[in-house]
C-alpha cells in the first residue's frame, strides 16, 4: 500500500478505501445526469408540458450520439490503465493523447451527421406537428456542440485513470453548477424556454469537456497522464473502441429503448405517458449514476491489477464490490418507493392526473434498482479486464434485447402496468446471464 495519503491504483483496497476512491466518480456521474434533469425541471415548470414532452422525445437521439465519447473514455482508460500497470508510462500518455484527438475528430463528424438527420429522426420518434418545432430547436443547439459533450465523457474516465478523481469531480461539479445557474436565469427568469435550456447545457458541457484540456496540456506533479505527441495507431484506437463497445451499446440501447417506450406510451396514455416516463428517466439517471460512477471508479483499479497479474486483488475487488452494490441496491429501492410521490411532484405537481400516473409508474419501475447495479458493474468489470466481447454481450442483452421483448410483450400479458415492469423483467433476465459470464470466466482471470 502506498505510504502517501493519495490513493493509488497499485494499492490494496479495503471497503473504506474503495468507497473513498469511487466517491468522486459517483458524484461526477450524478452531476452529469443533472444536466437533463435540471433542463427538464425548468422546462416542465416554466415552459409547459408540450416543451417538456418534446425535450424527452428528442433527447434519446442526442444521447445516442454523445455516448461515443463514453465508449472511447471507458475503453481507452482501461487500455491506458493496463499499460500503466505494465510500467510503460510513456506509451500510456501517447495513447491517451491519441484518444483525445480522436474524440475531437469523431465529435465534429457526428455533429454534422446528427444535424442532417435531426428532422427525419424526430418524425420517426413520433414528433407531432405540435412537438416537431420544439424538438428541432433543442436538438440543433445541442448537436452543434456535440464534441464538448463527448470530451466531457472522455475526461471523466481519464481523471480516474490519472489518479485524480477529485479533480474530475471539481470539473463536473463546476459544469453542473453552471448548468443550474444558467437554467434558472435563461429559462426561469428570462423565459427563453427550450432555447435557454439547451444553451445552458452547452455552456456547462464546455466547462466539463473543454476546460480539462488546459489541465492535461502540461505534465503536472502527482498526475500520471498528460497530453503529449499522440501515438497514431488505428489498431490501438480500434482496441480501445471495441473494449468500450459495451458502454456504447448500453447508451445506444438505452436511447433506442427510450424511443420505443415513448412510442408505446403515446399509444397507451398520449403525451402524458411520455411526460411521466421522462420523470422516471430523471430519477433513474440519478440512481443509475451511482452504479455507473462506482463501476467507472473501480475499472482502472481492476485494469491495473489485471495488467500487473495480481489475482488476489482482483478477487478482493470483486467480492467487496458485490457487497457494496447489494447494500446500495436495497437502499435505492427503499428510498425510491418512499419518495415516489414527492419526486414526481417536483416535475409534474401542476397536473393531478399526470402526477398520479407518474407516481404509480415510478413505484413499479424502481424495483429494478435492486438488480441493475450487478449488471452495470458486471459489464464494466469485463471492460476493465479488456474483454469487450463479454461486456458488450451483457450490455446488449440487458439494455436492448430483454427490454425490447419485455416492452412489447408484458403489456399484452398483464396490461398497462407491464410497460413500467418491463425494465424489472429485463434486469432479472440479464442478472442470470451476468452471473453465468462471471462463473465461466473464473479460471481465465482468477477472480473467484
Language model regions located:
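Short alpha-helical transmembrane segments in multi-pass integral membrane proteins
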Residues: 1-25, 80-147, 189-245, 302-368, ...
Amino acid at each position: 500500500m502506498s505510504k502517501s495519503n493519495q490513493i493509488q491504483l497499485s494499492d490494496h483496497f479495503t471497503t473504506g478505501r474503495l468507497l473513498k476512491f469511487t466517491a468522486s466518480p459517483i458524484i461526477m456521474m450524478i452531476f452529469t445526469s443533472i444536466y437533463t434533469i435540471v433542463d427538464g425541471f425548468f422546462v416542465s415548470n416554466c415552459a409547459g408540458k408540450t416543451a417538456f414532452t418534446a425535450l424527452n422525445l428528442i433527447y434519446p437521439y442526442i444521447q445516442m450520439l454523445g455516448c461515443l465519447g463514453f465508449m472511447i473514455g471507458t475503453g481507452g482508460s482501461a487500455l491506458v490503465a493496463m499499460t500503466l500497470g505494465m510500467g510503460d508510462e510513456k506509451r500510456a500518455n501517447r495513447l491517451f493523447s491519441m484518444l483525445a484527438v480522436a474524440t475531437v475528430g469523431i465529435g465534429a463528424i457526428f455533429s454534422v451527421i446528427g444535424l442532417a438527420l435531426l428532422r427525419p429522426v424526430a418524425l420517426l420518434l413520433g414528433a407531432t406537428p405540435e412537438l416537431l418545432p420544439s424538438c428541432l430547436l433543442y436538438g440543433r443547439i445541442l448537436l452543434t456542440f456535440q464534441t464538448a459533450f463527448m470530451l466531457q465523457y472522455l475526461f471523466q474516465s481519464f481523471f480516474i485513470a490519472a489518479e485524480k478523481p477529485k479533480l474530475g469531480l471539481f470539473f463536473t461539479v463546476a459544469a453542473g453548477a453552471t448548468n443550474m445557474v444558467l437554467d434558472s436565469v435563461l429559462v426561469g427568469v428570462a423565459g427563453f424556454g427550450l432555447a435557454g435550456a439547451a444553451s445552458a447545457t452547452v455552456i456547462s458541457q464546455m466547462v466539463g469537456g473543454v476546460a480539462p484540456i488546459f489541465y492535461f496540456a502540461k505534465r503536472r506533479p502527482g498526475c500520471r497522464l498528460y497530453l503529449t505527441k499522440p501515438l497514431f495507431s488505428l489498431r490501438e484506437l480500434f482496441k480501445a473502441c471495441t473494449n468500450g463497445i459495451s458502454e456504447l451499446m448500453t447508451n445506444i440501447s438505452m436511447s433506442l429503448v427510450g424511443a420505443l417506450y415513448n412510442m408505446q406510451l403515446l399509444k397507451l396514455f398520449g403525451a402524458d405517458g411520455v411526460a411521466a416516463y421522462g420523470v422516471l428517466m430523471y430519477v433513474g439517471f440519478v440512481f443509475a449514476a451511482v452504479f455507473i460512477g462506482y463501476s467507472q471508479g473501480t475499472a482502472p483499479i481492476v485494469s491495473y491489477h489485471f495488467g500487473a497479474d495480481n489475482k488476489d486483488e482482483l478477487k478482493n475487488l470483486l467480492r467487496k464490490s458485490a457487497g457494496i452494490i447489494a447494500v446500495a441496491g436495497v437502499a435505492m429501492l427503499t428510498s425510491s418507493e418512499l419518495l415516489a410521490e414527492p419526486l414526481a411532484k417536483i416535475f409534474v405537481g401542476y397536473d393531478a392526473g399526470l402526477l398520479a400516473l407518474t407516481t404509480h409508474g415510478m413505484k413499479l419501475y424502481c424495483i429494478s434498482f435492486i438488480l441493475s447495479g450487478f449488471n452495470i458493474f458486471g459489464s464494466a468489470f469485463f471492460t476493465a479486464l479488456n474483454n469487450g466481447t463479454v461486456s458488450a454481450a451483457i450490455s446488449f442483452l440487458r439494455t436492448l434485447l430483454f427490454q425490447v421483448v419485455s416492452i412489447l410483450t408484458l403489456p399484452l400479458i398483464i396490461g398497462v402496468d407491464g410497460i413500467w415492469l418491463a425494465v424489472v423483467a429485463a434486469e432479472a433476465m440479464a442478472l442470470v446471464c451476468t452471473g453465468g459470464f462471471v462463473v465461466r470466466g473464473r479460471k481465465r482471470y482468477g477472480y473467484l
